[in-house]
Amino acid sequence: MTDLELKQKLQDILVQGEDGRQDLLPVYADPELFSDIVAALARGYEGKVDYVVAPEAMGWVLGAAVATRLGAGFAGVRKLENGVYLNEDICRVIFMDHEKKRRSFGVPLNWNAKGKRVLLVDDWIKTGSQVQALISLCERFDCPIQGIAVIGADRRDIIREWLEKGQLRCVDIRE
């Protein structure tokens, strides 16, 4: 499927919620569409990535699939608000999400992606704050970032910047 056909199929199936977010569950439920999206996001990163890094929770679904497609490891990043790392030493990064709420990502200090080439994968970029937090976290662990791959993004200056620099692979961009 061409990128244009993929974008059209995606636009036909996506439903925007009342909060402005896209409901991606129908995409994940369509095996052909999901497979085509995973292939599109992985394209160009073959042999260039040791780990795919993705945030909890929906990013994990997509990130694990892209990692499998690339033959790479998967390094999940937890949202610390979920309280998983209660008794571990962690590296934390704090950011403001698209709703202007204070959030934090964290990984154990012995994170498996340390020093490895990584591809950042998420489902959708609203403001770029989550991706910027992932970048900051990866930089703390000396992980060379090979790129960013997402199903979709809202049109913002940071998105344009990443696209112009060739850092972002995105199936769909919305106004």
Q: Could you describe each region identified by the protein language model?
A:
Residues 62-71, 134-135:
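Short Gly/Thr/Asp-enriched flexible loops that form oxyanion-binding sites at enzyme active sites
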Residues 72-118:
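Short, glycine/charge-rich flexible loops or terminal/linker lids adjacent to PRPP-binding catalytic cores
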Residues 122-131:
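Acidic, divalent-metal-coordinating active-site segment for phosphoryl/phosphodiester hydrolysis
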